[in-house]
């Protein structure tokens, strides 16, 4: 009987395992950490009872994922919760760009820029599932929705700073630029509009929800579904050589490419090993968790209701800071993402103490301390927040890499998002999941479609393995 082993119990490893198990393949998942989840783990990092997401926090692509939507994970305890305001981007003037799930309400809030917002996002939202069905697959495939893909591609190929010229107000331009900055790539480069378009449209199509009880609920539900299908998960098992798993007919590796090359050793063709070791990792995150009494006192009222905030000032300021981190320098005012998941999910708080999530974009492997720079950015738009902080927990890039080995140098996107690598990750190949070793596949976020808690990397890789078994 065909047997499969999955190395790594992050969302993509579990997605691969579930996909194989659905086809009757016995699956064992081996996870080095004491708990499953990879980047979706949730911890009481600051004070007992306060739930902080360790990395992945807000999930616009999860509800859009064809794989996750097919599983009915709510049956296994997953509950999605939405904040009143999905995203806010405050400016020094006291105003803010505000993303709501309603396209019309968002456009209305942008005033004179509302019609242009509708023109850009209306068609994409109307055909969002068709676009997702294309971009969540490998680049080399026969499109089922070519017109929808083409319409998306026209804008996606542009630098974010160029596409943003369709809006005149600082609020609309900053709102789009902050979302585009999720790509960890200079906004004046080609293809940076793609992230901004996809995540903003996801907000209008599905919202930017959080998982009740923390992001761990997503992978806990995946694990429950796998167990229901007869799969097995073993934690605290570090796989250090291919020989430990070579007995399996199918091996799925939820690993960074360099780690996969090291694991497979001489079994991997030299040309593939060279490509994997040359795989480029991008800038890092510097993350802090805060316990804040009474919440963050944002100057802008919409920010007090927002589940996610982007702190970086104007589009031009964000473009400058992203350029700086790519040059290896920490800006005085780095781009910061703040999560207030407790607004949608009060179970994460204890009384008047609330967990606040924040990370800054910093250079790859940044060895310094960005804690005060992050708090300064929050204070910039919420004067007095320092006095409300009662506890903090810090994860530097090196500590993020220790927490999750796929985050090489603190790169939580599991790879640089330059256009060539986005198109051809993790190497030039007809099958991006094949490692060159028979029966062994890479299924991490280093494969298409890339980062995000959507499980599609694992799903696609498992589908590749199943085709080879036929």
Where are these regions (language model features)?
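Helical element adjacent to the flavin cofactor pocket in flavoenzyme catalytic cores
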Residues: 198-240
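Glycine-rich phosphate/pyrophosphate-binding beta-alpha loops
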Residues: 54-61, 181-185, 285-287, 344, ...
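N-terminal glycine-rich phosphate/pyrophosphate-binding loop and immediately adjacent elements
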Residues: 2-130, 416
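Mid-domain catalytic core of redox enzymes
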Residues: 231, 237-349
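A conserved FAD-binding loop/helix module that cradles the flavin
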Residues: 443-469
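Flavin-binding catalytic cores
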Residues: 116, 295-296, 329-331, 366-405
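A glycine-rich dinucleotide-binding beta-alpha-beta segment and adjacent secondary-structure elements
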Residues: 173-186, 333-337, 384-448
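Rossmann-like flavin
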Residues: 92-191
């Amino acid at each position: 009987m065909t047997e499969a082993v999955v190395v790594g119990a992050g969302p993509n490893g579990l997605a691969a395992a579930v996909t194989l198990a659905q086809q009757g393949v016995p699956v064992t998942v081996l996870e080095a950490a004491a708990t499953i989840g990879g980047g979706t783990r949730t911890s009481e990092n600051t004070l007992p009872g306060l739930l902080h997401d360790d990395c992945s926090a807000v999930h616009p692509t999860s509800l859009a994922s064809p794989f996750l939507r097919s599983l009915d994970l709510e049956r296994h305890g997953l509950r999605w919760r939405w904040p009143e305001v999905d995203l806010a981007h405050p400016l020094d003037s006291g105003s803010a760009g505000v993303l709501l799930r309603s396209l019309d309400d968002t456009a209305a809030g942008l005033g004179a820029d509302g019609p242009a917002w509708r023109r850009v996002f209306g068609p994409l939202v109307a055909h969002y599932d068709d676009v997702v069905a294309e971009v969540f697959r490998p680049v080399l495939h026969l499109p089922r929705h070519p017109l929808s893909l083409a319409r998306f591609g026209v804008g996606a190929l542009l630098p974010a700073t160029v596409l943003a010229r369709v809006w005149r107000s600082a609020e609309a331009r900053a709102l789009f630029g902050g979302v585009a900055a999720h790509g960890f790539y200079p906004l004046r480069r080609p293809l940076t509009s793609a992230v901004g378009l996809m995540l903003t449209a996801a907000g209008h199509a599905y919202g930017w929800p959080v998982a009740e009880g923390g992001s761990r609920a997503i992978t806990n539900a995946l694990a429950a579904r796998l167990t229901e299908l007869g799969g097995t998960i073993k934690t605290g098992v570090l796989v250090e050589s291919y020989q430990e798993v070579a007995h399996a007919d199918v091996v799925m590796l939820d690993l960074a490419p360099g780690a996969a090359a090291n694991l497979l050793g001489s079994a991997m063709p030299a040309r593939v090993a060279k490509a994997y070791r040359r795989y480029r990792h991008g800038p890092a995150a510097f993350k802090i968790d805060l316990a804040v009494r009474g919440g963050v006192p944002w100057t802008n009222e919409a920010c007090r209701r927002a589940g996610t905030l982007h702190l970086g000032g104007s589009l031009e300021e964000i473009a400058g800071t992203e350029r700086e981190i790519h040059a290896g320098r920490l800006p005085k005012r780095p781009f910061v993402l703040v999560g207030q998941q407790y607004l949608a999910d009060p179970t994460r708080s204890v009384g008047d103490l609330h967990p606040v999530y924040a990370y800054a974009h910093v250079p790859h492997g940044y060895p310094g301390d960005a804690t005060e720079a992050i708090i300064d950015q929050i204070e910039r738009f919420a004067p007095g927040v320092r006095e409300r902080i009662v506890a903090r927990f810090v994860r530097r890039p090196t500590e993020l890499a220790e927490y999750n080995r796929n985050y090489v140098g603190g790169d939580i996107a599991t790879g640089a998002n330059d256009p060539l690598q986005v198109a051809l990750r993790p190497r030039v190949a007809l099958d991006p999941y094949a490692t060159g070793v028979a029966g062994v596949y890479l299924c991490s976020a280093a494969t298409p479609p890339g980062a995000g808690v959507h499980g599609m990397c694992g799903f696609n890789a498992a589908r590749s393995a199943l085709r080879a078994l036929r």
